[in-house]
């Protein structure tokens, strides 16, 4: 008898969402099928699946041991979230080559269902970073007598949902800073920066309204700017490795001496990025909005406002502090807080982010320069995949103006 051959071995998931993409959360049931197609008749010892979820970090550092001796120090750490095994055909022992242990599979296509439940405890969101990752996968192994096993692995995505409708993420973020430039014995007037955003939590695809006032009482020409940064932190063996990446930015008008610029809701759109990861012990992903003043020949004046990128978008009537920039007409008076009859909610995370977009979106930048211009050219490079048009005209004003701003002395007349 001529034995048949394995033509294909595939894994498919039973997707329960409209996008037909396998996306799950803690406590969900992951189900699917192992699809086997054979030509002719084959004998099988076992068909197994192995499902696993884990976070893993790894990086290396060069060390100097003295006397021109150098060595490499490896830093690795791993956290396992679940480990599930099941046998779809056959038995546990693959070394049993007796005829009694074989199962015959006839020519054609065959499906073998599998199912397992994810832990109820919080799981880290799927992530691919510079020095680590969070991955979830199912692996199928087909074992046959006297032949090498056929193996296949397929990943699926897990989101640990972050609801931005919680009070802590709906609270406004604001700050004020001032800087005085000195050159030898000469001191110029101060440069002041005040900035505020409506809330801390956003989802990809939303635009952040930036309210800011920049006053230039110095003798130099300055430029106000804003940027969204992602910070990846990896932990292993008591050490920490950090990577900072630019995800979006914008530039204001140049300010000459004695001038002031006001941003009344300047828009900065959040591109497709991974949500924040805050509950993993070895990988942490955080975001911040940096509003800053580019000062030639001096350290920049910058103000960091923390952000959380979530997966559950803002409810249309969730809060009076909710951003309505993407749902309301441009001529709506923001001060009156009048809402449209049926505003459209911001897009959900799955609607705007694909795995390919998330991986390709981030452009690495140096994390240790702290905004010093050590190299030629602009401080922040554009992400080539995301070139932003100028923000639309916006006539809305800050509903909660800083009363002390009216009492602040303006630049002296020149």
UniProtKB/Swiss-Prot annotation:
Induction: By troglitazone and pioglitazone (selective PPARG agonists), by prostaglandin J2 (PGJ2) and by L165,041 (a PPARD ligand), by vitamin D3 and, to a lesser extent, by phorbol myristate acetate (PMA) in the promyelocytic leukemia HL-60 cells. No induction by retinoic acid, nor by clofibrate (a specific PPARA agonist). Up-regulated by fasting.
Tissue specificity as recorded in UniProt: Highly expressed in skeletal muscle, placenta, kidney, lung, liver, blood, adrenal gland, lymph node, mammary gland, thyroid, and trachea. Very low levels in colon, thymus, spleen, small intestine, bladder and bone marrow. Strong expression in differentiated adipocytes compared to preadipocytes. Detected in omental fat and subcutaneous fat tissue.
Gene3D superfamilies named among the record's database cross-references: 2.60.40.640
Pfam families linked to this entry: Arrestin_C, Arrestin_N
Biased segments, Basic and acidic residues type: 405-414
Membrane topology: Peripheral membrane protein
GO cellular component: cytoplasm; early endosome; endosome; lysosome; plasma membrane
Motif PPxY motif 1, residue numbers: 346-349
Short sequence motif named PPxY motif 2, residue ranges: 391-394
Disordered: region residues: 393-414
GO biological process: fat pad development; heat generation; negative regulation of adenylate cyclase-activating adrenergic receptor signaling pathway; negative regulation of cold-induced thermogenesis; negative regulation of heat generation; negative regulation of locomotion involved in locomotory behavior; positive regulation of hippo signaling; positive regulation of ubiquitin-protein transferase activity
GO molecular function: beta-3 adrenergic receptor binding
Keywords: Cell membrane, Cytoplasm, Endosome, Lysosome, Membrane, Repeat
Protein localization: Cytoplasm; Cell membrane; Lysosome; Endosome
Function text: Adapter protein that plays a role in regulating cell-surface expression of adrenergic receptors and probably also other G protein-coupled receptors. Plays a role in NEDD4-mediated ubiquitination and endocytosis af activated ADRB2 and subsequent ADRB2 degradation. May recruit NEDD4 to ADRB2. Alternatively, may function as adapter protein that does not play a major role in recruiting NEDD4 to ADRB2, but rather plays a role in a targeting ADRB2 to endosomes.
Assembly: Interacts (via PPxY motifs) with NEDD4 (via WW domains). Interacts with ADRB2. Interacts with ADRB3. Interacts with HGS (via PPxY motifs). Does not bind TXN (thioredoxin). Interacts with ITCH. Interacts with WWP1 (via WW domains).
Protein family per UniProt: Belongs to the arrestin family.
Name of this chain's protein: Arrestin domain-containing protein 3
Species whose genome carries this gene: Homo sapiens
């Amino acid at each position: 008898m001529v034995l048949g051959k394995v033509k294909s071995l595939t894994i498919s998931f039973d997707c329960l969402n409209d996008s037909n993409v396998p996306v799950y959360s803690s406590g969900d049931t992951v189900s699917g099928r192992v699809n086997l197609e054979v030509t002719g008749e084959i004998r099988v010892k076992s068909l197994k699946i192995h499902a696993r979820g884990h976070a893993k970090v790894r990086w290396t550092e060069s060390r100097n041991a003295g006397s021109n001796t150098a060595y490499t120090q490896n830093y690795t750490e791993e956290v396992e979230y679940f480990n599930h095994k099941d046998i779809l055909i056959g038995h546990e022992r693959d070394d049993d080559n007796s005829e009694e242990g074989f199962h015959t599979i006839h020519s054609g296509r065959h499906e073998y269902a599998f199912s397992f439940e994810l832990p109820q405890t919080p799981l880290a969101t799927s992530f691919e970073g510079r020095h680590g990752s969070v991955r979830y996968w199912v692996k199928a192994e087909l074992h046959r007598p006297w032949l090498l096993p056929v193996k296949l692995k397929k990943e699926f995505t897990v989101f640990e949902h972050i609801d931005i409708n919680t009070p802590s993420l709906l609270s406004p973020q604001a700050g004020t800073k001032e800087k005085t430039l000195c050159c030898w014995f000469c001191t110029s007037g101060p440069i002041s920066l005040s900035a505020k955003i409506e809330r801390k939590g956003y989802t990809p695809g939303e635009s952040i309204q930036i309210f800011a006032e920049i006053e230039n009482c110095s003798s130099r020409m300055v430029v106000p700017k804003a940027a969204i940064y992602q910070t990846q932190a990896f932990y292993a063996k008591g050490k920490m490795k950090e990577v900072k990446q630019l995800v979006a930015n914008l530039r204001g008008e140049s300010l000459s001496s004695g001038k002031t610029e006001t941003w009344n809701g300047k828009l900065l759109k959040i591109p497709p990025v991974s949500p924040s990861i805050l509950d993993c012990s070895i990988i942490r992903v955080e975001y911040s909005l940096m509003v800053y003043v580019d000062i030639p020949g001096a350290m920049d004046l910058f103000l960091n406002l923390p952000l959380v990128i979530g997966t559950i978008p803002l409810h249309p009537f969730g809060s009076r502090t909710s951003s309505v920039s993407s749902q309301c007409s441009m001529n709506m008076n923001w001060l009156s807080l009048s809402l449209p009859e049926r505003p459209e909610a911001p897009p959900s995370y799955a609607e705007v982010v694909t795995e390919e977009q998330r991986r390709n979106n981030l452009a690495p930048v140096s994390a240790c320069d702290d905004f010093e211009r050590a190299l030629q050219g602009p401080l922040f490079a554009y992400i080539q995949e995301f070139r932003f048009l100028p923000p639309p005209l916006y006539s809305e004003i800050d509903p909660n103006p800083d009363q002390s701003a009216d009492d602040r002395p303006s630049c002296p007349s020149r």
